[in-house]
Amino acid sequence: MTHFKNYNNTIDTLKQLGANQLQIKTVTTGDIYEISLETNELYPLMHINPVNAVAQNNQMTLNFQIFIMDLVFPDESNEQEVLSDCLSICNDLIGTLKNGESLYLSNADQGESPAYFTEGDITIEPFTERFDNSVSGWVFTLPIVIENDYNTCIAPQLTTYAGK
């Protein structure tokens, strides 16, 4: 039974949001420099790059860089269109996380609840010719706030006294 979200199901949710967005053809995760753009032939591509986690009272913020990119013709004649389409995809993803009802689907029988949130303004930055092949797109840092009760009763640790 999962009452609170964690890193694994947050990544899985982001991957599913990418898969649900009909323009995105490929979703990848991990360090952006490990992505093999030559082998990923289906574009537009969404890449999820974990940045860090911030522990707070009763919650944790997981920060991710989200890259949305597409191929640009060698003469760059479609670069403006690629940037426009990729920005629209970014807007869709951010809107879903801020307002989307798809995150409110939960399995009440299993004790699950919709516990993903994002807060504040999100800056979306364009990039062109950033990687080895001709891709352009946008990147933004996405803070995902998840509930976390820091329950030490279920932590896999000895319960003997540790202080001196």
Language-model segment annotations:
Residues M1-T28, N49-K164:
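Charged, amphipathic alpha-helical segments and their flanking helix caps
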Residues T39-V51:
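A short, hydrophobic beta-strand-centered structural micro-motif
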